[in-house]
Amino acid sequence: MGQKVNPKGIRLGIIKDWDSKWYASSKDYSKYLLSDIKVRNYLFKKLINASVSRVQIGRLVNNAKVTIYTARPGIVIGKKGADIEQLKLIVSKMMGIPVHINIEEIKKPELDARLVAENIAQQLEKRVMYRRAVKRVLGNATRLGAQGIKVMVSGRLNGAEIARSEWYREGRVPLHTFRADVDYSSYGAKTQYGVIGIKVWIFKGEILDHKKGTLDEVAHRGAINQIAKK
C-alpha cells in the first residue's frame, strides 16, 4: 500500500520553514525539543478559542521569540494586553529564559489546513452531519482562492457500527510536486461514538522562485552534508 508522507515535512528547506529555529549541542537538543513541545501544547490548549494555527519558536543565547499565528488576535492579546502579558510570564517560566511574544494574524482562516480541520471537528461535535460540514469548507476554500482542497474523515461516521474512511476533493492537490504550496493538518473530533479523525490538504498554488533555493540547490546542500558526515 502506498503511504503518504507529511506534505509540510517533505518541503522543509524548499518552500516551507521550520517551526523551531535554534541550534543546540547534542546534550541540550532533547531538552530544548521537549521544552518546545510543552510550550506548544500549553498554548494550543490555553488558546483553544483563539483559532491558533501554528506556534513558531526561535531561541537566541539568553532569550526566545515565540510567534503565534491566529485568526483571532484580539482574544490572544486580551483587554489592554493583559492576557498576552500573562502568557509571556508563564511561557518564560516554562522555558527558563525571557520570552518575547509576537502575534501574526491569519487573514484567510478558510485557507489554513489546521483551522479548517478544527472547524470541521467543532461542527461534528455539535452533531452536524459530516457531509454537510465537509462540503461547506470545500466551498469556502475554493471561493477564497484555493486551487484545490482534499478532506478525509475516518471513524464511526454518523454513529455507524463499523468505522470507515471517506474522501472529498475539490480541484487538484499535487502532493508529488515540491514547489506546490500544500498545507496539511490533522485533527480529532471527540463525538459520543468515539473519535473521528480529520485530515485536510489545501493546495494554494505553485511557488516558482523562493529564497530557500531551487530543488537542485537543496539537493546540492544535502550532498555536501553527507560528505561532511563521512
UniProtKB/Swiss-Prot annotation:
Domain of life: Bacteria
Keyword Acetylation: no
One GO-annotated biological process of the protein: translation
Cross-referenced CDD domains: KH-II_30S_S3
SMART domains: KH (SM00322)
GO CC annotation terms, alphabetical: cytosolic small ribosomal subunit
Domain KH type-2: 39-107
A molecular-function term among this protein's GO annotations: rRNA binding
Keyword annotations of the record: Ribonucleoprotein, Ribosomal protein, RNA-binding, rRNA-binding
InterPro entries membership: KH_dom, KH_dom-like_a/b, KH_dom_type_2, KH_sf_prok-type, Ribosomal_S3_C_sf, Ribosomal_uS3_bac-typ, Ribosomal_uS3_C, Ribosomal_uS3_CS
Family under the similarity heading: Belongs to the universal ribosomal protein uS3 family.
Subunit structure: Part of the 30S ribosomal subunit. Forms a tight complex with proteins S10 and S14.
Functional summary from the UniProt entry: Binds the lower part of the 30S subunit head. Binds mRNA in the 70S ribosome, positioning it for translation.
Protein name per the record: Small ribosomal subunit protein uS3
Organism: Vesicomyosocius okutanii subsp. Calyptogena okutanii (strain HA)
Organism lineage: Bacteria, Pseudomonadati, Pseudomonadota, Gammaproteobacteria, Candidatus Pseudothioglobaceae
Gene: rpsC
